[in-house]
Design a protein with these regions (language model features):
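N-terminal pre-domain segments of enzymes
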Residues: 1-4
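Catalytic nucleophile-elbow at a beta strand-turn-alpha helix junction centered on a G-D-S/GDSL motif
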Residues: 6-21, 46-51
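Alpha-helical cap/lid subdomain in secreted, periplasmic
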Residues: 23-41, 48-180
Length: 180
């Protein structure tokens, strides 16, 4: 549940990084919570993984930026980049995700207590009729496995998780993505 005055920091990979150009998530949440005066700060970067923060020197750490934006809530979009490590990388991903959650819960970025964390799984790849693009089946199997791993960690750590994989695996309208 979002509270009045919440500052929501968005972390993760290309999905939230690209979404900042469209603003649909922020718009829908603001519209649904118009009386709550929410603030959104998108800190996502396409190359980010749960254990990495790819920025230039002296940019600041993830924790420093979460403190700068006084994060009450963290929307964490992870699992896509990590999924390229295949089945062999799942246990390391679960360990890194659990550590991220524990580390974030130990912080007080906003001065109002530990942040509330919402995990978002990767979306499924869209099958496009472009022979230049790779087949999506193997990648989607990995994405499904990483989504399941995220669900396990979310349950174990008592955080909310939004499964974006399942509804998108059923198919997206043509043109929903630029590259599948």
């Amino acid at each position: 549940e979002l509270k009045s005055g919440d500052s929501i920091a968005i972390l993760g990979n290309a999905l939230p990084d690209r979404s900042q150009h469209f603003g649909w998530l922020e718009t829908l949440l603001t519209q649904a919570n118009a009386e709550k005066d929410l603030t959104f700060r998108n800190l996502a970067f396409s190359g980010d993984e749960v254990q990495t923060w790819h920025r230039i020197d002296n940019f600041g750490t993830r924790d420093e930026w979460l403190a700068k934006v006084k994060a009450d809530v963290i929307f964490a979009f992870y699992g896509y980049n990590e999924s390229f490590k295949g089945y062999e990388g799942i246990e390391e991903f679960k360990k890194n995700l659990a550590k991220f959650i524990d580390d974030a819960k130990a912080q007080n970025y906003s001065g109002k207590g530990a942040p509330r964390i919402v995990l978002f799984s990767p979306i499924a790849l869209q099958k496009l009729a472009n022979p230049s693009l790779p087949k999506v089946e193997d990648t989607n199997t990995n994405l499904q496995n990483y989504t399941a791993a995220m669900l396990d960690v979310a349950k174990a750590k008592g955080v909310v998780m939004v499964d974006l994989y399942q509804p998108t695996a059923k198919g997206l309208p043509e043109g929903s993505t630029l590259d599948g």
